[in-house]
Regions:
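Active-site scaffold segments
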Residues: 52, 72-74, 161-167
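Hydrophobic residues positioned within well-ordered beta-strands of beta-sheet architectures
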Residues: 21-23, 40-42, 53, 69, ...
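Structural motif
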Residues: 18-20, 50-52, 130, 139, ...
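Active-site/ligand-binding surface loops and adjacent short beta/alpha elements
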Residues: 64-66, 74-145
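Short coil/turn motifs at secondary-structure junctions
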Residues: 28, 49, 60-62, 76-78
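Active-site pocket scaffolds in enzymes
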Residues: 140-176
Length: 176
């Protein structure tokens, strides 16, 4: 996990129509629980209408580097009960009491899915790498360029927000 690690600004560019920042995090002295040397490069590009993130993971070791990428953005809505989400999936991930993946089950739902009074802490196998989110104030589309895509949805209690989390693997990826 690198969510709490210090990334270094490698490049910062501003243009007339967009801005870019490249962040780097590198591990040359690995820890016991993840004994691999690697470098992560994040390139954010911001325009008036979009935010793109390109992630590059570089193996700096002489052995294979197992990893899964996940991005955990939260999106606020004036009224989440009036919001909708749309994604293409026929499989939901089944987890044990510790949220460790144990199996899959069939998933079927009319799309777009209303978020009215819905509580989520669920993961899905995506058949198409696009997720659409519609709120009373704005709409957005999240896409991925990966071959295999997963989606984690999480709604914190008593908030008008949802975490829409695109991932390249499931939780506990080392064992799955």
């Amino acid at each position: 996990l690198v969510y709490d690690k210090p990334f270094v600004i490698d490049e910062l560019k501003a243009f007339e129509n967009h801005a870019e920042v490249k962040l780097i995090y590198e591990v040359m002295n690995p820890i016991d629980s993840y004994p691999f040397k690697f470098r992560i490069e994040l390139l954010y590009k911001l325009t008036k209408e979009s935010l793109s993130l390109k992630m590059n993971v570089i193996n700096l070791d002489d052995k294979k580097l197992p990893f899964t990428l996940g991005w955990h953005p939260y999106f606020k809505s004036y009224d989440l009960n009036q919001s909708l989400i749309k994604f293409n999936s026929t499989k939901k991930i089944k987890c044990d009491k510790n949220n460790i993946t144990i199996d899959t089950e069939e998933f079927s739902s009319k799309m777009p899915l209303s978020l009215n009074k819905k509580i989520f802490d669920d993961a899905f196998i995506l058949e198409h790498p696009s997720i659409e989110f519609y709120t009373p104030e704005y709409d957005l589309v999240l896409t991925s360029s990966e071959k295999e895509n997963f989606l984690q949805l999480y709604t914190p209690i008593n908030t008008n927000a949802i975490a829409i989390e695109p991932m390249t693997g499931v939780s506990d990826s080392f064992n799955n």
